[in-house]
Amino acid sequence: EPLFRSRSFHIGLGVAYPYGNSTVLPFEKRYFSGGANSVRGWTVRSLGPGRYKDKDGRINFITQTGDLKLDLNLEYRTHLFGKFNGAAFIDAGNIWTLRDYEEQPGGKFTWQGLITDLAVSYGLGLRLNFDYFVLRFDCGMKAINPAYQTEDEAHYPLIHPDFSRDFAFHFAVGMPF
């Protein structure tokens, strides 16, 4: 089997807007962020929208959805040995709402807040390549958490990591992009 090294880059952008007599998108049509195919430092549906943070700090699948999504992924892939491949990655992205919603403070998209609202994570992955499909195990860590806007430990977990808060483990079938 030939040795390989590659760099893969992915940009994902989505915008959804309610039309007709609807003022809000149906829940199943809204975007979510975090998880094995998004910003891998967050568990699935636990990121955003924007700077939004649930009052009790828990994940809320209903309010952590949005109308706009941006994913930026950079991955370095290499062969390790046998059927095992490795990856190192950096992910950035978030979701936002197009309107202000009382139950999602800090979630509305603004051009001025685009950079400060981006969540950033990094990590390592192990892939088991069976030729017809790939089993993937990724460990991501938050580097910048937009839900915390002050210069405290939670905003920059890269400097002050908390294992229970800032790491996410993912098992998936297939490549992330």
What do these predicted ranges mean?
Residues F4, A16, H79-K83, F130-F133, ...:
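Outer-membrane beta-barrel channels and translocator barrels
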Residues F109-L124, L128:
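Extended hydrophobic/aromatic segments used for targeting, binding, or gating
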Residues R5-I11, G86-I90, L124, L135-F137, ...:
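Transmembrane beta-strands of outer-membrane beta-barrel proteins
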Residues L126-F133, F163-F177:
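Outer-membrane beta-barrel "beta-signal"
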Residues D67-D71, A119-G123, D166-H170:
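Transmembrane beta-barrel architecture of outer-membrane proteins
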Residues A92-F109, Y132, G140-I159, M175:
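C-terminal beta-signal and adjacent terminal beta-strands/loops
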Residues F4-T78, A88-W111, A154:
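C-terminal outer-membrane beta-barrel translocator/porin domains of Gram-negative envelope proteins
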